[in-house]
Amino acid sequence: MADDNVSFTDQGTAVGDEKKKGGSSAMLDMLGQLEKKETKKKGKKNKKSKKKAKKGKTKKVRKADKYESQNFLFRVEGAMFCAGIIVAMIMLFVIIIYGIITSSQTGGQFNRYMAPLF
């Protein structure tokens, strides 16, 4: 097949297929021959070739996402934001609890408690 001097613009001799393919060229004929499956021979040699083909497989490597690092930063930023909100709420509750405790100690009169400051 490699020794054939074929021009890729030559028309092939297709009988009855000209309407379907719109005319065939030598290039299409060669590609058609390459695409045909070879007949399998039964025997031990065929089994060995299958085993070799199975051994040649490679593991699939995880392809890094284009935006993976950006998504990671968004997750970290979101976690920090939520943590900030939680810390602010805890501080607010501490101030409210401290106010309740001091108001109960002073009998609800903050002027008496604040008198040393004024």
Swiss-Prot record:
Species of the source: Caenorhabditis elegans
Transmembrane segments: 81-101
Region (Disordered): 1-63
Membrane topology type: Single-pass membrane protein
Subcellular location: Membrane
Keyword field: Membrane, Transmembrane, Transmembrane helix
Protein origin, superkingdom: Eukaryota
GO CC annotations, alphabetized: membrane
Name of the protein in question: Uncharacterized protein C27D6.3
